[in-house]
Every structure is written in structure tokens, then in C-alpha cells.
Amino acid sequence: LVVSTAKKDQQQTTASGKVTFDFKHVLTRVTMKAKTDKSISSNAETKVYITGISLKHTTKLAGEATINMNDATWALPTLPTDASKYLTSPYILAATSSNGVLKLENPAWKGYTTPAVSINETAASLFTDNQYLFFIPIDGTTGTTGGDEVQASITYDIATIPSSGATTAAVSSFTKEVNLGTGIFAQGKAYAFTFTIGLNSIEVDVTDSFDWDTTGEDKNVTVN
């Protein structure tokens, strides 16, 4: 969704005979990637599978809002009166097979068959190719002001061969939450969240250097 702010009182003598439009993105776009750190990737007999992702928020992600087409500003639902107009928390990301974006597949490795995204030490997209999440921005171009206003809750399995010659992997399941930081989900910006899965923690790297109305910026947060 792109909107051009109003151009008023244009005249041929001052506009060179042309009407110009300044189009800008008014939503915020999100994609997600994941990889393993060296504590896991160094073991060829261990695999990591992401089985689910949800977003938790403190009534920040609106499900509906009103945009002023004149100046491209948003009016968010009033709290607490219109709390029902915000997305549920947690907001579960659905699989592509369920009209969502999460690229869940069937690994079929050493008896492990849970629908999941297999990851390794090379960052790979968790979404189906050319699929993104689009959100109504939080507080216009400001984005989040508190690091815990939006969190990612990641559920993943670590499957490993318990002994030499074993044909069935032993599986341990985990769910960890990580704050996505401040200044995110801002109007006109596109974000790539890269999660690094370790044995004891998840680290998230946030990049917004895309061809939207943005400048490059990286942030690192670690959750233990």
C-alpha cells in the first residue's frame, strides 16, 4: 500500500507543467530468517527445526485503523475502548498450507517428521519465497518505544543421534521469547529479523536497510 501526500495549489508556471506525486509506503513489512550458532552447527549429528513462531505484544499491533489519505497518517484504535481492534496476543504465524507465510515442511530425518523449518549455520528465510507480513505501523514513524512491546516467541526442536549407529533421533523441544527492540514496526520501513538459535539462547539481529522509506540500521539483542 502506497499513498501520495496531497499536492495543493499546483500551477503550470511553478511546476513546469507537470503534476508530481510523492508516493510512500504506509505499512510496515516483516520477514524472518534463522540460523544456528557454532555450538550446534559443529555437530553433524544434530539438527534444529523451527516448528512455530508467534508475536506477543502489549496491545500494539492493530488489526484495523484509519488512514488519512491527505497526509498519510494513521489513527489507531483508542484504548481501552477499542482493544478488540488489535491483533490477538500471541499472534500465531500460520503455515503456508493454511494461507500463512511460515514455510513448514516435512523433514523426515532419523524418524523426525514434525512439520518444521530446518535450519543450519547459513541464515535461511522462514517464509515462503516472496511472502511477507504487513502490519499497521506502531505510532506512525516512531515504532516501538519499549524493547518488550513486541516479542517473538519461537518454538523449536533439537534432534540428535543419541548413540553411534542409532536410527532414531532423540528430540528436545524448546520455546524461547526474545524482545524485538525499540524503533521497530515503524511506518514505511521493512524489517528482516534474523534469529540465531543456540543451545542456551536466541539472538536476534534486526535489519531495515531496504528500498522502502528507510536508512540502514542494525540492532542486536540476546535472550538467555
Where are these regions (language model features)?
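Extracytoplasmic cysteine-anchoring/structural motifs
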Residues: 1-224
